[in-house]
Design a protein with these regions (language model features):
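Conserved S-adenosyl-L-methionine
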Residues: 4, 9-116, 179-182
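Signature of N6-adenine DNA methyltransferases within the class I
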Residues: 3-4, 8-17, 37-45, 83, ...
Length: 227
């Protein structure tokens, strides 16, 4: 699918805020977690670190922690280089905590076409920012045929990521996404806003902070929390 994407990863302080806002801090064992465009693991590694610290605080054995990591965490990354970096970063984290390697459920694939037969308690992410003009015709066709928010008009690449995440979210689950502010005003995001209107619990505006100013011009961001 769309490999010509913008690879800009999430700053650590924003990662922590997103996880804090959805209360990813306690009673984490057995709670499923998905990051669907994980890059080199900025968000995923912090979530895994919190999970391990919680388990150790509860006195869980290393074997039980490893089992939980294999069952509770899923991630997807299309770019092969970032996919390998993410696995290496996660394995380094295991080593830091004195844990053996685990079989991570991380997929080097396109989230939009991948089938995951599971729903999640937590979905956190920073989906790729790609405008309609930079999506090739094949991908436009696939997205338009498979996502209600993209049936009409000039959708951005993050729209189907948001819609698909809602499908994977458990009832009562929580989602935190870092997204461009234009979805709140773009005429072509009207159908996406309809999908979101009864589900949003909080919106944080980072326009003044300019999280990605070093890398991207004309992109303001907001964190969107759904419950």
């Amino acid at each position: 699918m769309e490999k010509n994407r913008c690879h800009v990863f999430t700053p650590a302080h924003i990662v922590n805020k997103m996880l804090d806002e959805i209360n990813y801090v306690d009673k984490l064992y057995g709670k499923t977690f998905l990051e669907n465009s994980c890059g080199d693991g900025q968000i995923l590694c912090e979530a895994v670190n919190r999970y391990i610290l919680y388990c150790k605080k509860e006195g869980f054995t290393d074997e039980k922690i490893a089992c939980g990591l294999e069952q509770d965490f899923y991630a997807v990354e299309l770019d092969e280089v970032n996919f390998e970096k993410c696995k290496n970063n996660l394995n380094s984290l295991l080593d830091l905590h004195g844990l053996k390697l685990v079989n991570w459920n991380i997929f080097n694939s396109d989230f939009l076409s991948l089938k995951i037969h599971k729903k999640f308690d937590f979905i956190v992410g920073n989906p790729p920012y790609v405008s309609y003009v930079n999506i090739n015709s094949e991908n436009r066709k696939f997205i338009r045929e498979n996502f209600e928010s993209c049936k009409k008009g000039k959708f951005d690449y993050c729209y189907p990521f948001i819609e698909l995440s809602l499908r994977y979210l458990k009832s009562g689950g929580k989602l935190a996404y870092l997204i461009p502010t234009n979805i709140f005003k773009n005429v072509f995001a009207k159908d996406l806003r309809k999908l979101l209107q009864d589900k949003v619990s909080k919106i944080f505006d980072f326009k003044k902070i300019k999280i990605f100013a070093k890398f991207m011009k004309n992109v303001a961001t907001r964190s969107l929390n759904l419950t």
